[in-house]
Amino acid sequence: MYGYPVTTVFPPVSIEDFLSLSIGHWISLRSQFKCSSIDDNWHSSERGDIKLALGPSDNSNTRNLAISMGSQYAMKLEFFLDGRLQSENCIIGTWQIWPDGSLELSYHDANGNEQCERIWFMKTNLRLRSTVAFNQDGTLRQASFCSEIRRVTKHKL
């Protein structure tokens, strides 16, 4: 069952459903726009590989998601069932599942910059993600959009 979502609930209605649907290997194409850049580097587009896995939880009030970029471990996000979010990388914020099944994350990074991220599934193997980042003074710093396609493995019969 490797590479396939565990849940059959679509669109997801809970954080458990959303995280379960997210597990696996994803191919990501990201377009990023930096608002502070005055030269030709204001826009970039890059392809990457993301691996998402459910991690063990210390208690029944949290759900953990381990995120790896390529072959490198990136971070673990801890989703508290009361809507709080934190990571070992000093990210502290909140999460919310919307009625359309999308997940909204709002958090501050280690530098105090605010980021708002929305992730939603078009199909079980196609995720979209938009992120808007603000400077500490509230001005727009950057925006990005990702389309992510799940890598699936053909099973031999």
From Swiss-Prot:
Cellular component GO terms held in the UniProt record: organellar chromatophore; plastid
Q: What is its EC number?
A: 4.-.-.-
Record localization: Plastid, Organellar chromatophore
* Main location per the UniProt record: plastid
Top-rank taxon, per record: Eukaryota
Which GO molecular-function terms appear in the entry?
lyase activity
UniProt cross-references to CDD domains, sorted A to Z: CpcS (cd16339)
Identify the keywords attached in UniProt to this record, alphabetized. Answer: Lyase, Organellar chromatophore, Plastid
Return the InterPro entries for the record: Calycin (IPR012674), CpcS/CpeS (IPR018536)
Tell me the enzyme class: lyase
Q: Which family does it belong to?
A: Belongs to the CpcS/CpeS biliprotein lyase family.
What does this gene product do? Answer: Covalently attaches a chromophore to Cys residue(s) of phycobiliproteins.
Q: Could you tell me what this protein is called?
A: Chromophore lyase CpcS/CpeS 1
| Source species | Paulinella chromatophora
Per UniProt, what is the name of the gene that codes for the protein in this document? cpcS1
